[in-house]
A protein has these predicted regions:
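Conserved mid-core segment of classical short-chain dehydrogenase/reductases
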Residues: 83-101, 124-130, 151-154, 194
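Alpha-helical segment proximal to the catalytic Tyr-Lys
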Residues: 120, 170-172
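Residue(s) in the substrate-gating loop at a strand-loop-helix junction
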Residues: 142
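Active-site helix of classical SDR
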Residues: 115, 158, 166
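Short, small/polar-rich loop/turn modules that mediate ligand/substrate recognition or access, typified
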Residues: 174, 179, 233-236
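C-terminal substrate-recognition "lid" of short-chain dehydrogenase/reductases
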Residues: 216-240, 245
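Canonical Rossmann dinucleotide-binding motif of NAD(H)/NADP(H)-dependent dehydrogenases/reductases
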Residues: 2-33
Length: 247
């Protein structure tokens, strides 16, 4: 797909990997719209829309605004998500069911909610001239989908759901010439990790097989761009983790 003047939607684009992705795609010539729940987010994107991905009405309204003000996206990168750690049974007793539901609602249901609305909008586009496709959807999972740690039952379940729906979504949306892929990052130097003490960061980096460091948000963004460009990548879950296997 040719990047120039194509519209790219990034959810969770106000910070972390989403922000890096938005900046990178904009530098490559795309017109970027960010959907994020943060009201006061600072963004250089062409369009910013406040959106709660867990609410169908919020997502549908955000899409209407996007189409009216910029056009229909050909690219969607779902980065919106949360990663709270909570044990099934902790010092205060059983994990509140509401805590589990919240993670599923934001990470899994939120991703699906955006995907369904975006796919419907993309299905009405003309085929892109060079690639003969209508669009590309890239979802964000995590290596926790495969090797979740203590306290990550909810998070791992939410990201595992994203992994599991990648292939069926790709198969179903193929009729509209829309590709669906998922990236499963490992330890990335997002604000969450960078706010930890340096010794903790160093300890985490040492667990990566090679290179012995935290991943960079820009490396996630670069992989997103490659997935957009490579027309044969479809229905795939790609680990971006330096061969890290969590124990």
């Amino acid at each position: 797909m040719n990047f120039t003047n194509q519209i790219a939607l990034i959810t969770g684009g106000a910070s972390g990997m989403g922000k890096a992705c938005a900046q990178y795609l904009q530098q490559r010539g795309m017109r970027v719209v960010i959907w994020d729940k943060q009201e006061d987010a600072q963004s250089d994107a062409e369009l910013f829309i406040q959106c709660d991905v867990t609410q169908d009405e919020s997502v549908e309204q955000a899409m209407q605004q996007t189409i009216a003000r910029l056009g229909t996206p050909r690219v969607c990168v779902n980065c919106a998500g949360i990663a709270p750690a909570k044990r099934i049974v902790g010092k205060e007793g059983a994990m509140p069911l509401a805590a589990f539901k919240q993670v599923i609602e934001v990470n899994l249901i939120g991703t699906f909610n955006v995907m369904r609305v975006v796919a419907h909008a993309m299905s009405g586009l003309e085929l892109e001239r060079t690639s003969q496709e209508r669009g590309v959807i890239i979802n964000t999972a995590s290596i926790a989908a495969f090797e979740g740690q203590i306290g990550q039952a909810a998070y791992s379940a939410s990201k595992g759901g994203i992994v599991s729906m990648t292939l069926p979504a790709a198969r179903e949306l193929a009729q509209f010439a829309i590709r669906v892929n998922t990236i499963a990052p490992g330890l990335i130097a997002t604000p969450l990790l960078l706010n930890m003490p340096q010794e903790v960061q160093d300890s985490l980096a040492a667990t990566v097989t090679f290179p012995k460091r935290l991943g960079r948000p820009e490396e996630f963004a670069s992989l997103v761009a490659h997935v957009i460009e490579n027309e044969m990548l479809n229905g795939e879950v790609i680990r971006l983790d330096g061969a890290l296997r969590m124990r």
